[in-house]
C-alpha cells in the first residue's frame, strides 16, 4: 500500500490539510458546544470535498498534466483570471503565515513559565520565532524538508500522547453543552474552512497520478477523510475534558494558543497535560509555518522572475517575511483574526474559483467523461455558501455577528 500512488497522494492531501488550523478549533468552538462543532466540521468537509472534485472535473481539460490552477484560470478567463488566481493564493498564504507567526509567538512567550521563569515579551517571542524558523525557509526546500521530517514524526507522537491523556477524562456532560450563542457557528465557519484547504496542491496531485480521474477522486476522498477523523477526535477530547463555562472564562482573559494551554492546565489540574498540549501545538504550528512560508518564498520567486524584478535571496526574504511579521507585531494576539481573513481568501480560492472554472468547463466541454454530481443547482448552492463565508469576517467587524475567541 505504501507504494500505491493513490494512497500516497491521499497522504499528501492529508498532510497538507492537517496543520495549525486545527489548533484554532478549540478556541473558536469553545462557546459552540461539541454537537454544533461536529455539524460544522462535517458540513465544511463535504463542501470542500465537492469543490476538490470540481477541480478533478476541470483538470480533464488541462493541456499539461502539471498545469497550475492559475494556468487553468487563464485558459477560461484570460489574463485577469491568472492574476486573480495568483494574487488570491499569495494573499491567502500571507494571511496564514501572519496567523502562524502570532500563534507561534504566543506559545513561545509562555514557554519560560514551564520552568518557573517570567513569561517572555510577546513581541520579542514573535521576532525570535520568525527569525529562527525563517532561516530554514531562506536556505530552501532542503532546509525545510530536513526539519519537517523530524518535526512531523514528533507531531504525530505528541498528538497520540495528547489523545491518550485526554480521552479517558472526557465527561459526557461537557459534550452535551449547547452553544452560548448560535451565531458562533456562523462566525467560526471561515476559520474552520482553512482546516480543509488542500486545493493548493491540485496540480501536483493530478500530475503525480498521471491525470487519472478515478485515482484523483479516490485520493481526495481518502485524503480528506483522514483529517476529518483527526479533527473530530481532537474536538471530542478538548470539548469533553474542558468545561465550557471555565474554558470560555479563561479564553476571555487570554484568547490565544497560550490561553488554550493555560485552560488545559487549570481545568484538568495537570501541569504536565498543559505542557503536552503546548508541545503538540508548537509542533503543529511550526510544520504549518514552514510549509506555508516556503510556498510564499517560492511563489514570490516565480512571480519576480516572470516580471523581471530583483529576485535575490535578500529581496525575497524581505518580501516574504516583512508583511506577516508587521501584522504580528502590530496585532500580536491576532491568531484567530488572521485565520478568519485567511478563511475569506480560502473561500475564494477553494470554492469560488473551482465553481467558476467548472461552470465554464461545462459550457465549453459538455461531453466530458466525468462530471461531479449535483448539476448546476449544486454549483449555485456552493457558490452562495462561498460568498456568505467571504462576507462573515466583515459582518463580525461591523458588529452583525459575535466575535469568536482571539
Curated annotation (Swiss-Prot):
It is a multi-pass membrane protein. It holds the Pfam family Trp_Tyr_perm. GO terms for cellular component: plasma membrane. The keyword Transmembrane applies. Transports tyrosine across the cytoplasmic membrane. The transport system is energized by the proton motive force. Keywords: Amino-acid transport, Cell inner membrane, Cell membrane, Membrane, Symport, Transmembrane, Transmembrane helix, Transport. InterPro entries: Amino_acid_transport_2, Trp/try_permease_CS, Trp_tyr_transpt. Belongs to the amino acid/polyamine transporter 2 family. Mtr/TnaB/TyrP permease subfamily. GO terms for biological process: amino acid transmembrane transport. One of its GO terms (molecular function) is symporter activity. PANTHER family: LOW AFFINITY TRYPTOPHAN PERMEASE-RELATED (PTHR46997), TYROSINE-SPECIFIC TRANSPORT SYSTEM (PTHR46997:SF2). This is Tyrosine-specific transport system 2. It comes from the Bacteria. It catalyses: L-tyrosine(in) + H(+)(in) = L-tyrosine(out) + H(+)(out). The chain crosses the membrane at residues 7-27, 38-58, 83-103, 119-139, 150-170, 183-203, 219-239, 279-299, 314-334, 335-355, 376-396. It is found in: Cell inner membrane. NCBIfam families: araaP.
